[in-house]
């Protein structure tokens, strides 16, 4: 992109130079005046600074050293014929060296083609040296120095202020860990105090072993020859847990013969089927609706009648209960007779004896003769 810009900038002065040469050949005095004006503008340092400001900030590497610029001396004016021959010679040389860039100087000035070529080669050589340098590996562990580190400075094009950037590595560890080939395991450095604390104390050993020096307990002969009594054997037997939930239900609940021989009806089979879960909110919380019709009274009477017992039904026990002879000969005591009588329900105020008030239980108070003789206030 930079090369195309240089070519476009270079082609523009070439066209201007060609136009000036034609004007000079035709004898146009404006060509000579413009050439002289261009030469004065280039040689004038103030004009040159204004031109550089109009062109904008360029690459600082493309600027020529001050000694090279100072070494070039351009004549004030030249003869038109000599200037034309000089321009043709420079153009032929640029075509031979394949240089698309042409200086913006006027015809009356000497073109610094050799100086520009040397500066360009010098910049290329400097750029190649920068690219040839290996990149900095920030993952290598290095000690951070206390003095100024590596950095670079630049001048802001908008503000005339100096900026300085200090480059510190952002990572202070390395991905490769150095393997120690001398040791297979890590041996920590244990101090003498740590070794003393790691030894078990004698008090704890005696406490846990019940003051026994050996794990084999000595058993006396009397304990070996002792015969346990029946009570001790009964107490030594483990208790059977009375877990009702863990016992098999076949031993607890026995199905009767009538339940085994029962034949379910169609209604029972219908009720035994599981209901489908409701999906709508109205089904979960139904709103009671008024009955559209009155139920049949004859149907209710039919349902109220006792059903006849089926011949296949085998009851668990005889409906006629057998009364024992001992029960028939029992004589009831007066206490049992009093308890057998039902309580007589009375009304709310029937047979209720209210507790007498204090004024009703005591005699009415009487005033003393002294109080009777005293004059009453207000009379």
From Swiss-Prot:
Residues modified to Phosphoserine: 295
Expression tissues: Testis specific.
Subcellular compartments: Nucleus
Repeat (THEG) residue spans along the chain: 118-137, 184-203, 222-241, 258-277, 290-309, 326-345
A single cellular component GO annotation: nucleus
Comp. bias intervals (Basic and acidic residues): 19-29, 38-50, 347-356, 368-379
Predominant localisation class: nucleus
Segments of skewed composition (Acidic residues): 56-76
Keywords, alphabetical: Developmental protein, Differentiation, Nucleus, Phosphoprotein, Repeat, Spermatogenesis
Record flagged with keyword Cell membrane: no
Function, in words: May be involved (but not essential) in spermatogenesis.
Name of protein: Sperm microtubule associated protein 2
Organism of provenance: Homo sapiens (Human)
